[in-house]
Each structure stands twice: as structure tokens, then as C-alpha cells.
């Protein structure tokens, strides 16, 4: 029997960064979560059987949990960073970080000293756990002694559980160097192991980047595949140099035994590896390393495609094995809009979630080392992950055909991923129940702008707010037959009004397209469809919208459309 499906990228449009996913064997579905920064509710849970259609089933963080996580007191682009979703000892577990907390604001908002002490002892790192993906979620369990961001939680085949994350290098060789460390953790108490064994008593540094002057090795994930434990990290920073690297360690009897074997081998070779700090280990020697890199790294990037490529910043990946569709990864990417200047790229939608098929390959020249130190050639060697084999980049459409005797995957790239001709219609006053707020500021409810161009009707009462952050936003409102507007670009602002000259029943709207915000009105009653509205409408006002881009405003988020009553 033959079945064909088509997966379209991005799978989650608009601001859905830092995706992490699992195959939920109990319910035969994929479960995926993304970062939400200062938005509440936060950590949305999406499910899908085959990646063609995603259903939003719940939010992990409600207003009450947001307060316990101190989200009301974070700065712009602070809050919930880079969740990792896993099943650990039968529980659904999310490891995550709260970043950019404003202590003064927290104290003024009623936080106790003990709350802040627990937060800082964990550097904002925490665990949430649940028996059902729909919740309720228990926590936060602040991870005392954690250090850095982007935590991963990994259960090995022997039952040992490892907490792994990235921190600034203690003794950096260059600016921007980070190091990935791991330590075993007790999943019942969520406290670090302290037994004197490798990765037990103190942190163990296992990676600092793939090459010379590598920066921002982060978003680590550990996976067991056959006799190996693989480490994947994003490197280069979440911008135009973003990439994904793969490393591995031979660990047929568990990661703990592999670490013990590394220590013995280092001792036999006379390898003297200086401690990073007292009580910590380092498995990055001059002669040998615990984890060996794929010589074909990076396994995923778009940085080699140049600035003519509209899909940039690709990385921060997470692997998944689907029982029918095989290996896949999910990652973030940014769809850029071309500016007026040479080489100018501008992002308004934020970082979105993309998927790609993954195959496992060996070096066919078996007389060479396979990029993994010692030449293991046994049948238990899975090889290395290859993303979108034969394409070398993300696809915008992936056709998957399953037959009785196998599976065929065909990734395709269109001429451009930069946008659609038909404008999306976002009516912020339609009473949607899926809106979010920023921190605990409930005067405006928002939704993600998921596509450009987008047409947004101006409410007849209340205001339309287009937000990048608290210092870069635009407000439009009706006052009689006039449209009033305010544009805030950091310390600069611009305000005014234009006569709408509308027929009764026709609502002016704002078109967000081609780096501009345009107020459009027609003589028609009602909005009709967005394409007709734009085609037949009169432009009353058109302003440069680049101040709403991430490149101008800074930070890590995308634009949202909001309703202010």
C-alpha cells in the first residue's frame, strides 16, 4: 500500500524558536515545544502524527506558574529560553532557563529574598514535570548548581540521567568561546549526583566548539544511537553564522563507563588535562578527547549560501526517530525580507520552526578514520547524521512516500521562501482565545505575526498595536473618521493622524509588507478578502517599518499584532 504526504516548512510560522520534540510512543504522536521568552501563557505544546498538521493542545506555563518562574520581572527578550522536552523515568520533563531577570523589579513586585536566592543558585535553570503532556505541570524545580543556558536532559540506557548545558568558557581562548558541561542528576529530587564518579562529583566539560575561534557552542543535546552517544550543538550564535555540529563517544555500556574508559586511556597516555575549576573534570585533552567530531561538520547550516538566500540563521536542532518516517530533525530558521540597501536583510517574523529528514551514513573510504578517533568498524556503528541528503540545505516542501518495502523522501526548494503574494488577514479584535500577553501586562493581548504580507484591520474601538519590543512598536486607532497613529523607535517617536474618508461599514487596515506599514482604506462595505482590499484600496499613509525588525530593534523575538481596549 502506498501513501504520500507533503510536509511544508516552516511547520510553525511566526515566533516559534528553539524547538524541541519527542516521539510519544504511548500515544503514537510527535510532541513539540518552543521558547516563548516573556510571553504568557508560555511553552506551547503542539502535537502531530506525521508533521503535516500540528495541533496546539496546551500551554505549559499559565499565569500562576509564570509568577513562580518570575516571568513578570524579566527584561525584553528575557524569560523562557530554549526548552528541552524528554521522557525521563516515565515522566514528561522540560528543562529550561529563565534569563534576564530584573532583581529590582522582582523585589518591588513582591518577590521574597528566598525566591531570588533559589533562582540565582540555579542561574534561572529549572525542571517542569508532568504525567500527561496536557498537564498539570509540577515545578519549577530550581536546579541548584546549574550554570549557563540551554539545558538538556538525557536518560541513558543504563538509567543514568545527565544534565548538560552551555556556559561561558572559564578560561576562554577568544571572545565568545563557551563550553558544554554535563553532570549526572537525580530525577527524583532534581539534585546533582555527588559520588566521586565521572560526571558525578562536579561538572565535566566535554566540548568547547568544533574549530579554532568557534563561538557560542550552545543548545547541546545528547542522544543514544546504537553503541554511541551523540552530542549535537549549535555554534556561531543565533544569527547569520548559525550552524549545527555533531560529535560522538563510543559508549556501548553507557556514558558513565565511557567516561571511565576515557580517564583510563588519558592516564595511560600520560595526558595531563588541567581542571577547569576545583572539583570539576575536563575531557578535552591535547592528544585525545572524549567526544570526537564529525569531520563533515556542520551537519546543517545556511551560512554558506550567502545573503541572497532568504532563509538564514538555521540551527538549534533536535533529533527524533519516527517509527514509520525514520530520522528527522527540527530546528529554527529566520525568513528574511530584503532591504533597499545592498546586502540588507531584515527579519520581522522572528525565529520559526523547520524540519528536515536525516539519514545516517559512513565514510565509504574505510581505509580512513571515520572521523571518530579510533577506527570502530563493527556493525553497531550507525555512522553520522546527514541532513537533507543530496540537497545540503533545508527544503521548503518535503514529499514522503511510504510503501510496503520502504520509504522515499523528496525534499524540494522553491525559488524563494521570503513571503507570499496573498496577504494574511489578522483581525486582533475577533476575540481569539489563543492570545498572549507580555509578562503580566494585560492591557494588550497579542498574537504572532506569522506571514508577510499581513493585513490588520484597525478596530472601530480600541487600538491595533504592532510590537517588536517595549521600545519599538506602532499603534493605530480610529477617532471619528480619522486614523491616529504613533510610531516608537527607541528614543524617537512619531505621531499624527490621517483622514480615513471611509464609507459606512468599511474599516481601514494596516498592511505590513515590503519593509513598510501602510494605512489602506476602500469605499467597500466590510473587509472582503485581503487581496481585493489591498488591490482596490487607497493608501493614506506609508511609513518605513524597518524599526520593527530584529536587526534594528535587537533581541530575539518576532513581531506581534495586539489589541488594546
Where are these predicted regions, by residue range?
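Carbohydrate-active catalytic/glycan-binding domains of CAZyme proteins
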Residues: 1-565
Amino acid at each position: 500500500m502506498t501513501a504520500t504526504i507533503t510536509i511544508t516548512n516552516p511547520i510553525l510560522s511566526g515566533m516559534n524558536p528553539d524547538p524541541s520534540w519527542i516521539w510519544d510512543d504511548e500515544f503514537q504522536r510527535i510532541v513539540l515545544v518552543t521558547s516563548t521568552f516573556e510571553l504568557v501563557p508560555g511553552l506551547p505544546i503542539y502535537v502531530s502524527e506525521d508533521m503535516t498538521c500540528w495541533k496546539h493542545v496546551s500551554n505549559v506555563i499559565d499565569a500562576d506558574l509564570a509568577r513562580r518562574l518570575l516571568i513578570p520581572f524579566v527584561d525584553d527578550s528575557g524569560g523562557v529560553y530554549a526548552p528541552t522536552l524528554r521522557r525521563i523515568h516515565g515522566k514528561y520533563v522540560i528543562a529550561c532557563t529563565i534569563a534576564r531577570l530584573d532583581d529590582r523589579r522582582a523585589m518591588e513586585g513582591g518577590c521574597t529574598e528566598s525566591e531570588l536566592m533559589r533562582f540565582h543558585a540555579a542561574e534561572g535553570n529549572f525542571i517542569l514535570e508532568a504525567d500527561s503532556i496536557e498537564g498539570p505541570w509540577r515545578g519549577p524545580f530550581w536546579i541548584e548548581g546549574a550554570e549557563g543556558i540551554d539545558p538538556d536532559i538525557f536518560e541513558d540506557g543504563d538509567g543514568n540521567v545527565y544534565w548538560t548545558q552551555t556556559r561561558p568558557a572559564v578560561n576562554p581562548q577568544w571572545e565568545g568561546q563557551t563550553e558544554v558541561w554535563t553532570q549526572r542528576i537525580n530525577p527524583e529530587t532534581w539534585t546533582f549526583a555527588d559520588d566521586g564518579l565521572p560526571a558525578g562529583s562536579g561538572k565535566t566539560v566535554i566540548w568547547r566548539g568544533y574549530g579554532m575561534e568557534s563561538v557560542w557552542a550552545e543548545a547541546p543535546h545528547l542522544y543514544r544511537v546504537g553503541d554511541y552517544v551523540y552530542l549535537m550543538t549549535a555554534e556561531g550564535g543565533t544569527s547569520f553564522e548559525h550552524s549545527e555540529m555533531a560529535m560522538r563517544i563510543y559508549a556501548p555500556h553507557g556514558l558513565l563507563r565511557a567516561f571511565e574508559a576515557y580517564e583510563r586511556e588519558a592516564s595511560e597516555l600520560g595526558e595531563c588535562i588541567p581542571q577547569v575549576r576545583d572539583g570539576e573534570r575536563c575531557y578535552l585533552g591535547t592528544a585525545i578527547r572524549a567526544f570526537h567530531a564529525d569531520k563533515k561538520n556542520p551537519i546543517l547550516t545556511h551560512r554558506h549560501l550567502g545573503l541572497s538566500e532568504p532563509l538564514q540563521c538555521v540551527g538549534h536542532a533536535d533529533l527524533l526517530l519516527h517509527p514509520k518516517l525514520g530520522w528527522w530533525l527540527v530546528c529554527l530558521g529566520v525568513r528574511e525580507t530584503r532591504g533597499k540597501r545592498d546586502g540588507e536583510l531584515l527579519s520581522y517574523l522572528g525565529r520559526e520552526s523547520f524540519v528536515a529528514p536525516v539519514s545516517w551514513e559512513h565514510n565509504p573510504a574505510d581505509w580512513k578514520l571515520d572521523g571518530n578517533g579510533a577506527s570502530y568498524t563493527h556493525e553497531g556503528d550507525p555512522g553520522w547524521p546527514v541532513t537533507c541528503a543530496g540537497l545540503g540545505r533545508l527544503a521548503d516542501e518535503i514529499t514522503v512516500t511510504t510503501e510496503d518495502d520502504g520509504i522515499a523522501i523528496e525534499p524540494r526548494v522553491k525559488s524563494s521562501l521570503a513571503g507570499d503574494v496573498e496577504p494574511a488577514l489578522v483581525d486582533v479584535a475577533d476575540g481569539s482565545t489563543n492570545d498572549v500577553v507580555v509578562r503580566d501586562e494585560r492591557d494588550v493581548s497579542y498574537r504572532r505575526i506569522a506571514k508577510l504580507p499581513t493585513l490588520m484591520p484597525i478596530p472601530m474601538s480600541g487600538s491595533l498595536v504592532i510590537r517588536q519590543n517595549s521600545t519599538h512598536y506602532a499603534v493605530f486607532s480610529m477617532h471619528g473618521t480619522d486614523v491616529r497613529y504613533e510610531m516608537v523607535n527607541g528614543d524617537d517617536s512619531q505621531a499624527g493622524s490621517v483622514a480615513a474618508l471611509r464609507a459606512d461599514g468599511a474599516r481601514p487596515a494596516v498592511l505590513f509588507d515590503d519593509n513598510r506599514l501602510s494605512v489602506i482604506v476602500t469605499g467597500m462595505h466590510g473587509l472582503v478578502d485581503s487581496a481585493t482590499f489591498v488591490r482596490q484600496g487607497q493608501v493614506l499613509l506609508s511609513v518605513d517599518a524597518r524599526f520593527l525588525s530584529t536587526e534594528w530593534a535587537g533581541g530575539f523575538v518576532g513581531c506581534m499584532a495586539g489589541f488594546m481596549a
